[in-house]
Amino acid sequence: MPSLELTTNVAIPDERAFVLEFSKFAAKVLSKPEQYISISVKHNPNLTFAGTFEPALLLAIVSLDNIDPEKNVNYSKELFGFFKEKLGVPDNRGYINFNDPGRSYLGYQSTTFTEIFGK
């Protein structure tokens, strides 16, 4: 069920194509089926990082059962590599926030994931 919300000050020429490519990449990196991946991209030209408007980003990831300190290191490496290649944002110009709220705190299909998959 990963949802990824990207905010960047980089203008993306074809946002829809980027979102679809990002969705496939995120599914691979997070080892989750793409059918459960949700991507949101927001362009904010006023986003600053380290006091400048140079290319920057903020990424919030909410995902169940696969967020942990060891995996987050690899996720960070892979995702920042993707953003460097696709958006020109270096790895020192953004933050990635990893969050696993727990199955009871995420709703889907009129219930929660605890009810769907158990504890």
Over which residues does each language-model region extend?
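Interaction-mediating elements
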Residues: 1-119
